[in-house]
A protein has these predicted regions:
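SAM-dependent transferase fold signal centered on methyltransferase-like domains
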Residues: 1-302
């Protein structure tokens, strides 16, 4: 995400300095902005050997004067001062929509860290000049949404990526979203494949399935099928045991997964008295709004 050759970063939302430290580990010199006096002292102490500059002020009030930067980094606060949760349609404080143009006069690149609950289509609508959007997960749980916006727009389309890391920060996969023509299977085949949340968030499910040789069960449904066993990184893989037009009466336990289905998981679990099971799964599907429903009983294999 950090542009190649970037040496000086302005971190407008330094907080305790975790992200600041990350930039410094990449060899960057960082200017930090933080209004809390206690955190300012912490930032100064922890940065005493790194050449770090700390500015005690709010991000909205900071002015760089004659300083120049390669990247401006902003992680907007997702809580109001009252402690109330900001709606996900609100990008937080400082609001990038209000200040982006100013930040781009300070550096050729702005890097935003947003709530991972923000939809990629909203990101592309709000920041049409973004050249890179990354949904970052750790052990399959989406943790962050990173958006990179250059001062000079690229002629290329915005690149969307799903990236997963292990607990030590090592990448386990990096999967791009791309426009692909995915074949539709005539029926559910011997195996099904469920993409990770980061892939779904980035819109990379179809490109992952295409690269893995899977087929679509239904257009727009983030579940795929194949005739072969797979351990492709980026999702969970299952062997199909049976397919039904209704939930089997003898199914006593299963983890329930819904795909474009009108009823919620807990409602189905209560209605049919199905206990939790970590190995056997019930996939409840509906093929489009008002379409046919089907139920797949499957065993997880990877």
């Amino acid at each position: 995400m950090i542009p190649e050759g970037a040496q000086r970063v302005l971190d407008l939302t330094a907080g305790s300095g975790i992200d600041t430290w990350g930039f410094e580990q990449h060899g960057c010199r960082v200017d930090c902005v933080e209004p809390d006096p206690y955190l300012v002292e912490l930032l100064k102490w922890n940065g005493r050997t790194t050449g770090r500059s700390v500015h005690e002020t709010k991000a909205e009030d900071f002015r760089p004067h004659s300083a120049t930067f390669d990247t401006v980094y902003v992680d907007p606060s997702r809580r109001e001062t009252s402690g109330a949760r900001i709606d996900f349609s609100d990008l937080g404080e400082p609001n990038p929509l209000e200040h982006l143009e100013t930040w781009l006069t300070w550096a050729p690149t702005v890097l935003l860290k947003l709530s991972p609950m923000v939809d990629r289509r909203a990101v592309q609508r709000w920041f049409p000049n973004a050249d890179l959007v990354v949904y970052l997960s750790r052990k399959r749980e989406v943790k962050e949404l990173l958006v990179r916006i250059p001062r000079v727009p690229s002629a290329a389309a915005t690149q969307l990526l799903a990236v997963d890391t292990d607990p030590f920060g090592t990448e386990t996969y990096r999967i791009p979203a791309s426009e692909v023509r995915l074949p539709s299977a005539p029926e559910v085949l011997g195996f099904i494949h469920d993409p990770d949340p980061a892939l779904r968030a980035a819109g990379a499910g179809d490109s992952w399935a295409h690269a893995s040789g899977f087929e679509a069960i239904h257009p727009g449904m983030s579940l795929y099928t194949s005739r072969f066993h797979s351990t492709a990184p980026g999702g969970r893989h299952f062997a199909v045991e049976s397919v039904h037009s209704h939930i089997p009466k003898d199914l006593k336990s299963a983890s329930i997964v819904t795909k474009t289905f009108p009823e919620k998981v807990e409602a189905l679990r209560t209605k049919y008295g199905i206990r939790e099971d970590s190995e056997r799964f019930l996939f409840a599907l509906q093929r489009g709004t008002g379409g046919a429903k089907s139920y797949i009983v499957a065993r997880r294999i990877h």
